[in-house]
Amino acid sequence: LRMSRGLGDVYKRQVVPVMAPLTHDGQGNMLNTNADTIAGETAKALSALFDVTLVYCFEKKGVLRDENDDDSVIPEITRAEFEQYVADGVIQGGMIPKLENSFEAINAGVSEVVITLASAINNSGGTRIKK
């Protein structure tokens, strides 16, 4: 919660923090932590004080039913649908941890998660995960 208050103060000043996904193991060794995990953990911490929407930007329009068809965006996905898509081989690779982080964030109090193109961040496209 201490981190939440510190970031909350930054947010209240209308400053946008930029965070690198670098962490350490407590033994002096630097680690390159998954950026989605850092974003998710930050969103979870802030959700204790604010209404938070977590946006994951990447090179596709959203979570796709067919990775070869950029227009096959799944507009909204539930945990059960996600698990079925994984079992069916529709969702695989790097999208699995991105969605796992998304559901963890929702379960921890984040209001909504959006997965979309960076250029589409201000419209209603992409894939949405809600409470």
What are these regions (language model features)?
Residues 121-131:
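Short, basic/aromatic-enriched C-terminal tail that caps enzymatic domains
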Residues 18-45, 73-122:
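Polyanion-binding loop/helix "lid" in catalytic or ligand-binding cores
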Residues 16-20, 55-57:
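Structural motif
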Residues 1-11:
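Single conserved hydrophobic/aromatic residue that forms the stacking wall/gate
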Residues 29-30, 65-68, 125-126:
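Short, well-ordered secondary-structure micro-motifs
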Residues 47-64, 112-118:
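Glycine-rich phosphate/pyrophosphate-binding loops
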Residues 12, 44-48:
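Short, conserved, surface-exposed binding loops centered on an aromatic residue
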Residues 9-14, 22-23:
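Glycine/proline-rich, flexible active-site/cofactor-binding loop segments
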